[in-house]
Each structure stands twice: as C-alpha cells, then as structure tokens.
Amino acid sequence: NFHIITMLRNLKVPHKSSEIFSVILPIFKVSMNLAHIKCLSMLLGALCAVQTVCLSKLAGAFDSKASRESCFRRIQRFMSQMVLDLDAVAGYLKSRIPSDGPYTLTMDRTNWKFGEVNINALVLGIAYDHMSFPILFRLLPKRGNSNCKERINIMQRFIRLFGRDSIKCLVADREFVGNEWFKWLNDNAIQYHIRIRDNFWVEDPRTNRNIRAQHIFANLKHGEERVLYRIYRICGELCYLSGAVIKDKTGKPEPQILVSFCRPEEALPAYKERWTIETMFKVLKSSGFNIEDTHMVHINRIEQLFGVVIIAYTWA
C-alpha cells in the first residue's frame, strides 16, 4: 500500500525532542508538569525512530545523555505516573489536519491479545487525504463487538469537543448496526453511510413487504452500482439504500450494501474513505509502531500508551 510505505518512510525521519516539546507544551501544560512533558517529547521522538512500544528499545533511542538503563527506568516511571488528558490529545490531533471540516468520520474497532489479556479498541477517526486521524478512542474491557452505548458515547464526546456541524458524515462497517444505534443517528440528523450484511431484512413501508437486502441488488454485476431513492425501513428506521458488487479479499465478487440517513448518491464514494482507518490500524500495529509488542496488562496504562502512539502516528 503506497500510503503505508510513505508514512513509514516519514516515521524514520529523526525528530528532535526539543522540536516536539515546543509543539506539545501549549497543549499539555495545564494537565502535566514540565518534567512529564519533556519525557513525553523524548518518548514520541523515540517512537518515531524505532517504531515499537518495546520499552528497552525506546530507551536506546531516547534523546538523552543518560544511560540506557536510566532512560528505561524513566520511561517506566513516566508510564506508571502519567495521566494523559485524552480531550487535549483529541484537540492536538485535530489541529494536525489542514482542514476546518466538515469531516468524514470513520468508526472501527481493532483488537489484539497478549497472553490471556484481550485488548479491544473502539476508534473514531477523521478521514483526510487518504489517511485516518484517530481523534477519539476507547479501550473496551471485553472481547468482541462494541455495543450501541459505547458508540453513542464516543460520538457524543466528538460532538462535545468539536460540534455536530463539524460532521459531514459517518462511515462504518457491518459491525456498526442496530435499532437503537440507527435511531440515535437519525434522531440527531447525523448523515451516515454504513454497510449492512447481505441477509439483512429490509421493509418497504409502502407495501409492508420484507425482503433480504441482497435480493434488491441481485442482478448487479461486478463493478456495477445502484442508488435507490425510495425510502426503506431497516432496523425499524427509515433509511436509503445503495449497493455495488466488489471483490472480497479472495477476489470473489460480493455485494456491498450501504444504508444512509440521506443523500444516498454520496454513499458509495464516501464509504471508500472507510479503508483509511484500516490503513491506520496497520501502521499502529505490525506494519508500523508494533503496538502489539506491549507487555502491559492494565487497561488504563494501555489506554495511555495507545494515546502516546497515536500522537506519534500523526506527528509523522
């Protein structure tokens, strides 16, 4: 992937901690002391240099004349004492986007496992220039899918920080469906384009007839698209439908069916932005920062580390 390769090349450019310090000082000076901000700036520079969360490797890349062992202990103390203001992190991340919006938001979830500990992150990003900036995230203390309350909470937090008018639309994959979720989006007039499973039941409110979504687009061939301007009822909510036939990961044709609050003609082009969040996950994980290397098991500390890695990701 061209965009992953470009980002990884940028990450390898050395970043002086003094330069990083001058940028992050105004953002964190209210919630962190100067010693912690300085340590954070050196940690960010080391992350960009070695692209791993392995503390011993980060200590070796610290912008400090102290010994590697001393730097290692300093990082350990910092990670145990640090309380990262995640609202401030979100404001900083948004400031890195050279656009005032409104934005296409991408919602997705990523997970990994260390020993018996399941680490499960719900992430809300802003799609811009073939990238997704991970503005907000929450580590879920469980395995499996997010629920409606967790999705609503992260959306409400975005609205509290940046306003509803900053949202152009939300795009998300098949996990992010449900009656209560669609109702909340509709009630708040948030434009969305969300993929549904092919076997979803769709009701035509004019006839009260139920039909599987895949049957509506059954005669489409690979590369063809269709936008339906009739309103349907899905998960109890009135929505629009659009569809296309794409190739899955194995190269086999499959339907891609989207449900929208309004403007269904924008659904298929907008949904292509969803792939930016998957690219971002690759950079955070095995293709870039190797966040899966963390040996932390306490969810609060992992959440803090996740925030630090996300800052380093956007610094590039």
Feature-to-residue mapping (PLM):
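TOPRIM metal-binding catalytic domain and adjacent DNA-binding surface shared by DnaG-type primases
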Residues: G45-A49, A61-R73, F78
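Short alpha-helical "recognition helix" segments of helix-turn-helix
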Residues: L58
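Single, function-defining residue in the core of a domain
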Residues: F2-C54, S64, M82, V89-A90, ...
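Active-site-proximal, Lys/Arg-enriched surface segment
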Residues: R68, F72-H130
